[in-house]
A protein has these predicted regions:
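Bacterial N-terminal signal peptides that target proteins for export
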Residues: 2-19
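C-terminal motif of bacterial Sec signal peptides marking the signal peptidase cleavage site
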Residues: 24-28
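Extracellular attachment/recognition segments
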Residues: 33-143
């Protein structure tokens, strides 16, 4: 009987050790989007297809379908913060981000929750953040 208990303890210890080893490997695998995060300023000159309509609506990128590769949506890395130059010259009443898993904006949706956070809004800049551990592509609309 004591021998049986020792075998169970050894098996249990081995199982725990194997589980901890798997956790350690899983935590160290790959550089997810957070491993490639960035905080940066996005000047208007970097957004080749941005436009300001006569109605005072500014768009960083067009909606799909894309007319050229230079109009692809901005890479919006996980765990990153972006300060956009504000082209309106006034504090926008509305800041809307559209997110897609595709650079051409297909299958996009309105950003919300931790994937699209508005940090600061002023006459000069709009600062947004992606707190998710996920890479998206972004289209920003200010009004």
């Amino acid at each position: 009987m004591p021998e049986m208990m020792r075998m169970r303890r050894r098996a249990s210890s081995t199982s725990v050790a194997a589980f901890l080893a798997i956790l350690a490997l899983a935590g160290g695998c790959g550089d997810g989007p957070c491993g490639n995060s960035e905080d940066r300023v996005v000047p208007l000159s970097e957004l080749a297809c941005n436009r300001l309509s006569g109605a005072g609506v500014w768009e960083s990128h067009p909606l799909p379908p894309m007319v050229s590769e230079e109009c692809e949506w901005l890479e919006f890395r996980g765990c990153s913060r972006y300060a956009f130059e504000n082209p309106l010259g006034a504090v926008p009443a509305s800041v809307v981000g559209y997110l897609s898993f595709d650079p051409d904006g297909r299958f996009s949706t309105v950003g919300s929750g931790n994937s699209f956070i508005v940090d600061e809004v002023s006459d000069d800049e709009v600062v947004i953040r992606n707190s998710q551990n996920q890479l998206f592509y972004l289209r920003l609309v200010l009004q």
